[in-house]
């Protein structure tokens, strides 16, 4: 993607960081997009209203294209840019960006409180990847004085689980890091699974880091509760009318780089998979716990502002 305007630098920088996973996690991605739109709006506020709107929409489309699976991106961009249709659009876009950032941080806090209610003293928790929301649940349970242990999967190929393990260890929590393929071996030691979410569909399916669906299947087989922590802006409104979520496939070089002799070996690297609703015990949102079958209600209630 080619960027020509110096004023577009903040959009370019944010796009590249999201695309290259320097900024990772749906919540962080959403806040980064809102912040970039705010800064860009301030830079181009000297333009007339029509030019301002066109430039903001262009910037929004660029950001959305960075990660096709992360529904937080289009939802956040649409939320912020809805200000273009209101009185004083320049001011409203900036205000709506701030509103989203503040509400997103508050959502993480509330998810922690609701989710911690499902964690019992003495529980061993399994988590996957590097989710702010899931980490908030675990930290809150620990802050409540519960004696807990956490197993983190390494989360190949980018090893985001290392980040989670370090974060929880620094917080004082007992942490064990395991390879992704060892989940079934250790499931007998696990009391509850808590993961994050990149998207929730209208029928309650979970789109999350590759490997999540296998963990859910193993947990279901072993009768271990499987919960996903998801802010309401991660619910995908267009799935209610049958739109499918595109699963991003990333560079094969993230997995392995072979010498020339083996260049013919194909490598597939999907970043996400889909966990069916039947394997999910509850979705932890900032408004409370809901069954996966209630996802359509969240979309209907909280996405009235998402217009085509």
From Swiss-Prot:
Keywords attached to this entry: Carbohydrate metabolism, Isomerase
Binding site residues for substrate: 24-27, 67, 208-209, 234
Entry superkingdom: Archaea
Entry-linked InterPro entries: IF-2B-related (IPR000649), IF_2B-like_C (IPR042529), Initiation_fac_2B_a/b/d (IPR011559), M1Pi_N (IPR027363), NagB/RpiA_transferase-like (IPR037171), R15Pi (IPR005250)
Residue numbers annotated as active site: 129, 198
GO biological process: L-methionine salvage from methylthioadenosine; pentose catabolic process
Coiled coil location: none
E.C. no: 5.3.1.29
Gene Ontology molecular function, alphabetical: ribose 1,5-bisphosphate isomerase activity; S-methyl-5-thioribose-1-phosphate isomerase activity
Family, similarity comment: Belongs to the eIF-2B alpha/beta/delta subunits family. R15P isomerase subfamily.
HAMAP family: R15P_isomerase
PANTHER family from the UniProt entry: METHYLTHIORIBOSE-1-PHOSPHATE ISOMERASE, RIBOSE 1,5-BISPHOSPHATE ISOMERASE
Described purpose of this protein according to its UniProt entry: Catalyzes the isomerization of ribose 1,5-bisphosphate (R15P) to ribulose 1,5-bisphosphate (RuBP), the CO(2) acceptor and substrate for RubisCO. Functions in an archaeal AMP degradation pathway, together with AMP phosphorylase and RubisCO.
Note: Reaction proceeds via a cis-phosphoenolate intermediate.
Protein name: Ribose 1,5-bisphosphate isomerase
Species whose genome carries this gene: Methanocaldococcus jannaschii (strain ATCC 43067 / DSM 2661 / JAL-1 / JCM 10045 / NBRC 100440) (Methanococcus jannaschii)
